[in-house]
């Protein structure tokens, strides 16, 4: 799987992800880009789960963003509805972490849209490690969102065998 972490602090939101693609116990690729900018660069998105599944979801989510003029919550809810009801989409196994200047959300394959506490998201196989690290850094340091996301992803990569140290980081200031 992978690790994706999103941190919001001081008018900045960041989504960061590692680059490892695994097939069973084998590393197939180490530099995959699992974090992207969508909707004219105003929305950040990262995925954990099957790579092909996630690209399908990115395309669908971007279409929903266009349909709803970039309104993140509305697009997320509409994607989640489709994910629950469409037979093809229901088979996709991935999680999306998405954020814009106002909200950070997790979109699940069960059709859930979750707005996390403290605007902190950590998903994927190393998500628990990244979340613990990011929480500690948020509560005990004055580091910015970018530094917290990067450090928590590094810690997750040191612990989780399905997470490596290749990082893709996107940030949005508002």
Curated annotation (Swiss-Prot):
The entry marks the following residues as binding Na(+), namely 157, 160, 163
Residues of the active site are 2
UniProt enzyme class: hydrolase
Chief place of localization: cytoplasm
- Carries keyword Nucleotidyltransferase? no
Q: Which GO terms describe its cellular component?
A: HslUV protease complex; proteasome core complex
Q: What would be one Pfam family of this protein?
A: Proteasome
Known function: Protease subunit of a proteasome-like degradation complex believed to be a general protein degrading machinery.
Q: Which family does it belong to?
A: Belongs to the peptidase T1B family. HslV subfamily.
- Protein name, entry field: ATP-dependent protease subunit HslV
UniProt source species: Shewanella amazonensis (strain ATCC BAA-1098 / SB2B)
Q: Show the taxonomic lineage.
A: Bacteria, Pseudomonadati, Pseudomonadota, Gammaproteobacteria, Alteromonadales
Gene that this polypeptide is encoded by: hslV
């Amino acid at each position: 799987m992978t690790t994706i972490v999103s941190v919001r602090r001081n008018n900045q939101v960041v989504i960061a992800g590692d680059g490892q693609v695994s097939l069973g116990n084998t590393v197939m690729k180490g530099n995959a880009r699992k974090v992207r900018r969508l909707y004219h660069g105003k929305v950040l998105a990262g995925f954990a789960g099957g790579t092909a599944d996630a690209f399908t979801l990115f395309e669908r989510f971007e279409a929903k963003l266009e349909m709803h003029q970039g309104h993140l919550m509305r697009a997320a809810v509409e994607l989640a509805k489709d994910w629950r009801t469409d037979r093809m989409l229901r088979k996709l196994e991935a999680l999306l972490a998405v954020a814009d200047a106002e909200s950070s959300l997790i979109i699940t394959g069960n059709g859930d849209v979750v707005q996390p506490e403290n605007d902190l998201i950590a998903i994927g196989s190393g998500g628990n490690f990244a979340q613990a690290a990011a929480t500690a850094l948020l509560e005990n340091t004055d580091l910015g969102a970018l530094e917290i996301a990067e450090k928590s992803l590094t810690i997750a990569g040191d612990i989780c065998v399905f997470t490596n140290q290749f990082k893709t980081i996107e940030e949005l200031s508002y």
